[in-house]
Amino acid sequence: MYAIIETGGKQYRVQEGDTLFVEKLEASKDDVVTIDNVLAVSKDGSLTIGSPIVEGAKVEAKVVEQGKGKKIIVFKYKPKKDYRRKQGHRQPYTKLIIEKINA
């Protein structure tokens, strides 16, 4: 059994027990979050596709940690001029473990 969910503007294929890194959610460690945006559910060999979401389907996940990704460097410059800008960015994420798929 698997489901396709949407969170943070991205889509993920999940099964029970999967570990997932998603865009930051407003939840603290060990909280259980419910994701209602279930786009499709496969159960016993049959695929149910929502339009746009499957009614009554939910995915429950436990928050394992909140963190930041690796740092990326953004460097802008203009040649032959004295213009240089260096900026770093670390994207915040939430690590989830999928506990249950209700369909």
Curated annotation (Swiss-Prot):
The keyword Ribonucleoprotein applies. One of its GO terms (biological process) is translation. Keywords: Ribonucleoprotein, Ribosomal protein, RNA-binding, rRNA-binding. InterPro entries: bL21-like, bL21-like_sf, Ribosomal_bL21, Ribosomal_bL21_CS. Pfam families: Ribosomal_L21p (PF00829). GO terms for cellular component: cytoplasm; ribonucleoprotein complex; ribosome. GO terms for molecular function: rRNA binding; structural constituent of ribosome. HAMAP family: Ribosomal_bL21 (MF_01363). This protein binds to 23S rRNA in the presence of protein L20. Part of the 50S ribosomal subunit. Contacts protein L20. PANTHER family: 50S RIBOSOMAL PROTEIN L21, LARGE RIBOSOMAL SUBUNIT PROTEIN BL21M. Belongs to the bacterial ribosomal protein bL21 family. This is Large ribosomal subunit protein bL21.
